[in-house]
Amino acid sequence: MKSLDDLDFDNRFARLGGAFSTEVLPDPIAEPRLVVASPAALALLDLPAETSDEALFAELFGGHKLWSEAEPRAMVYSGHQFGSYNPRLGDGRGLLLGEVINQAGEHWDLHLKGAGQTPYSRMGDGRAVLRSSIREFLASEALPALGIPSSRALCVIGSSTPVWREKKESAATLLRLAPSHVRFGHFEYFYYTRQHDQLKQLAAFVLEHHFADCNAAERPYAAMFRQVVERNAELIARWQAYGFCHGVMNTDNMSILGITFDYGPYAFLDDFDANHICNHSDDAGRYSFSNQVPIAHWNLAALAQALTPLVEVDELRASLDLFLPLYQAHYLDLMRRRLGLGVAAENDQALVQELLQRMQGSAVDYSLFFRRLGEETPERALASLRDDFVDREAFDRWAEAYRRRVEEEGGDQESRRRRMHAVNPLYVLRNYLAQQAIEAAEQGDYTEVRLLHQVLSRPFEEQPGMERFTRRPPDWGRHLEISCSS
């Protein structure tokens, strides 16, 4: 095991030079204290799960202390925000502290969010608030537990530093981990500023360190873009299958690695609503739940445009054309598994779409429906679920088709139950649960956020005494729209 103050650094991105980032030191927050830490994320750096030295966490990630090998830098990038190009964004409140190598030889970026002002702060104060930091921490660790690729969160540090958003709040920092923090917007920045040499330098860097298998291809950059398309098709399929709504799918929030990145006003669906908008700033619903698939394709097309100096347009288009069929294949496979079906059949897509149509407008909890469906035999489970649907006759027709499908596939009920429980979570990160943990933390009580994190790290297992985390939201917690302010 390593110790927190003795990590091995290899700052590859910093070596790209000043065109890609600016050296900035963290601005310390006052009276830093550890709010919550993730044992699973600590393990990625070969660190012990126990956070016995909370003072060291607070010093390092509150900006008061820095490793001698760290090279904190603010990265420059641009991006399309709600469909409009913003020519200069960059890390306005976050710093890439450096890259740490673990014992397996993996590189992990250490990125401190809320580290203070940078040249890219755009009139902002460079701070993150406790509320948004806790939300990002919880999601960064909850999604991987569901099998959804994501950046990770090591810890949240609270403080007494005041910041003003809609109201006075307290500043916090979040230490984010990812194999890379390169975004679609990095490529867009160098493309639209016509810095094509730097664009190629960035592409070569990403190719070498994150898509090395593409080097053997006849046209490596074309092969790399195809893999980016493939990864994003699978990522979005997982979002849709598990009812995750990102909320701000700007191109600067899209990771080149195809992982969930830059959490803001996200939500998991409570009642199923294909048109759910979780971001209260998204008046037009550009980033609604149902729009995530076409928006991901749109964002990939924006990245493709930025790569035109390196890849032939026909090759980029051919890869883009793969996105939808790849997405559909991944999504149908996941939904088939959530329904307890192990073998593909011709009418599976219709079976899934009919179920979602029946759910729309009904008081059906999206996550608990699948969990309850696997609890008992199909006949008994379907009978107990029937009352949640508005059009019960239509549900009965779907239920009969599903029952026949299960019967045709065969197998015993216990095996079916185990399969379904392995892919259908009992615990999901509902906004009302996060809000309750945040409100307690804002009063200095971190018990709830730590307990919620612990429960969400094992979403498929029944955890005695944790039944309250399975409950549907109260009236005040249904369909919450979250602010972008953070």
UniProtKB/Swiss-Prot annotation:
Mg(2+) binds at residues 253, 262. Its cofactor is Mg(2+); Mn(2+). Its EC number is 2.7.7.-, 2.7.7.108. It catalyses: L-seryl-[protein] + ATP = 3-O-(5'-adenylyl)-L-seryl-[protein] + diphosphate; L-threonyl-[protein] + ATP = 3-O-(5'-adenylyl)-L-threonyl-[protein] + diphosphate; L-tyrosyl-[protein] + ATP = O-(5'-adenylyl)-L-tyrosyl-[protein] + diphosphate; L-histidyl-[protein] + UTP = N(tele)-(5'-uridylyl)-L-histidyl-[protein] + diphosphate. The keyword ATP-binding applies. InterPro entries: SelO (IPR003846). Pfam families: SelO. ATP binds at residues 90, 92-93, 113, 125-126, 176, 183, 262. Keywords: ATP-binding, Magnesium, Manganese, Metal-binding, Nucleotide-binding, Nucleotidyltransferase, Transferase. The keyword Nucleotidyltransferase applies. One of its GO terms (molecular function) is AMPylase activity. The active site is at residue 252. Belongs to the SELO family. PANTHER family: PROTEIN ADENYLYLTRANSFERASE SELO, MITOCHONDRIAL (PTHR32057:SF14). Nucleotidyltransferase involved in the post-translational modification of proteins. It can catalyze the addition of adenosine monophosphate (AMP) or uridine monophosphate (UMP) to a protein, resulting in modifications known as AMPylation and UMPylation. This is Protein nucleotidyltransferase YdiU. The lineage of its organism: Bacteria, Pseudomonadati, Pseudomonadota, Gammaproteobacteria, Pseudomonadales. The gene is ydiU.
